[in-house]
Design a protein with these regions (language model features):
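Active-site loop-to-helix "anion-binding N-cap" substructures in soluble metabolic enzymes
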Residues: 1-240, 247-261, 265-317
């Protein structure tokens, strides 16, 4: 066992496996994580799948390879467990677009609307605590359809996901003006350009993309549903319009097909700088030192837990 620091001659993967056994830890990784972290994870998935795994685990320690709000969600669902995040600075532009104090001020200023607040899971614990129910891209349509018919809906923080759900359900909602900086970099022009190179390849896009990009897609869905779409599609080449880390999972689970990363106007490198802050070395250090740890005040955790549990219950029905 290494006492401190990182021995660069050491096999980090084996060392992480040993630490995981010693700590009775589970490793959860989002689809957008670097390949090395996806490969050592016990479960790789989207926000909904990771929420289920976090809620069900019997491990004492959760090493969450994702961004801050995801690790917070794991802690909200597991108050007695130690939740580690390899890099505590792994934030999210979408989450940061909706600070809880701004949402609280907005709700107070529009109290007459009596909003039913549906929050995309890509938000802070503070925003979750102000919400009636949480959703993910995988269940957003179902959650919106279940909302009380006599209430005005405020959907936060992603305006593109919210607009897509309105298109799917016909339910009018007021949308918070937030977005994912990666998904809005994909444009109609950049997607049309790649289609000229691969004219027979269907396009699958994430609903966080803009309306213009969604219009060009053959399928718009969550990252988890992208796996199913790509597996079932007869196409041998598929253009994937989401964060580039998703391609690693697709190549592993759907071998024999060519997955083309959707380009932005600038490059073929649609990588989230926050997701890529986590590394194998940082994961090793987190398990070795049992930090950085996610800590939440209990009162905040309990308020944030209720809308998450409501989502998990509605998702089952």
């Amino acid at each position: 066992m290494v006492a401190a620091g990182v021995n660069f001659g050491l096999d980090l993967v084996e060392e992480i496996a040993e630490l995981k056994r010693e700590r009775n830890a589970v490793i959860l990784a989002h689809n957008y994580q670097v390949p090395e972290l996806q490969d050592i994870a016990d479960y790789v998935g989207d926000s909904l799948g990771l929420s289920y795994q976090a809620a069900q685990t019997d491990a004492d320690v959760i090493l969450f390879c994702g961004v801050h709000f995801m690790a917070e969600t794991a802690k909200i669902l597991n108050p007695t467990k130690k939740v580690l995040l390899p890099d505590l600075d792994a934030g999210c532009s979408l989450s940061e677009s909706c600070p809880p104090e701004k949402l609280k001020a907005f709700l107070d200023a529009h109290a007459e609307k009596n909003y039913y607040v549906i929050a995309y899971i890509n938000c802070s614990a503070g925003v979750k605590a102000l919400s009636d129910v949480i959703c993910t891209s995988g269940n957003a349509e179902k959650i919106v359809r279940s909302a009380p018919a006599d209430r005005n809906i405020l959907f936060v923080p992603d305006q593109n996901l919210g607009a897509w759900v309105m298109e799917r359900t016909g339910r009018k909602m007021d949308l918070w003006q937030g977005n994912c900086y990666i998904h809005v970099e994909f444009t109609a022009r950049s997607i049309n350009r790649i289609r000229e190179t691969y004219p027979n390849a269907p396009v699958v896009a994430h609903p966080e993309c803009t309306y213009a990009v969604r219009l060009l897609a053959d399928e718009v869905c969550s990252t988890e549903k992208m796996v199913t779409f790509c597996r079932n599609s007869p196409a041998r080449e598929i253009i994937v319009v989401t964060e580039a880390g998703m391609l690693h999972r697709l190549k592993k689970e759907v071998p024999g097909k060519l997955f083309i990363p959707g380009p932005t106007e600038n490059c073929f490198c649609g990588e989230c700088r926050f997701m890529k802050m986590n590394t194998l070395e940082k994961a090793h250090a987190a398990l070795l030192n049992m930090s950085p740890e996610i800590v939440l005040p209990e009162a905040l955790r309990k308020r944030a837990e209720a809308p998450i549990l409501r989502m998990l219950e509605l998702s089952k029905s």
